[in-house]
Amino acid sequence: MNNLTLLDMFKHGTATWSAVSSFVVVLFWCVGCWLAFIAIVNYKNAADGKSGIAKPIIQTIIAAIMVAVSRFIPILSATLNNKAAEFSPQSLLSDIPQDGLGLNLAFTSVLLFVQMLGTIAIFRGFLMIWEATNKGAGSGLIGKSWTHIIGGVLAVNIQLTISTVAATFYPGVDLSFLGL
């Protein structure tokens, strides 16, 4: 049996983190379609006088955003970073220069893991906004959901986030090992 090394774990991790990020983006679309169906049912309830019209309208907007999220993440990225780029976790693989030690592979794996967590955070943020449209939702739910969405966008763009923080607090620091 082969001995599993840390480098092997990072190699396998890079493919996994990319696949999970792509899966969550597809999951956004599926859940968005389901939530749109629920919003349509709530329009019927509003027409019958069982609930107000504001709830299904907000739910329709949230569902539409979730269906369009594969195009929405790059728009948020462009807004935050002044740089329009297609959301593609696999693009990180070519940005970081590789060497024989495998250290850069480890950085790539960690950055892809952070991107995956960011994608999940955005997904969770939208579900929290959806939950806030229901009666009895917690008072801090909207703030928490926006924190998840903004933090998720920063995590999806982790290289640019690191670059911005480094330029702000440590001007002149060399970030070439991150592909920046």
PLM feature spans:
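Extended repeat-based interaction scaffolds and adjacent low-complexity, acidic/S/T/P-biased segments
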Residues: 86-87
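Hydrophobic alpha-helical segments involved in membrane association or supramolecular assembly
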Residues: 3-83, 100-180
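Short membrane-interface loop/juxtamembrane segments of multi-pass integral membrane proteins
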Residues: 90-103
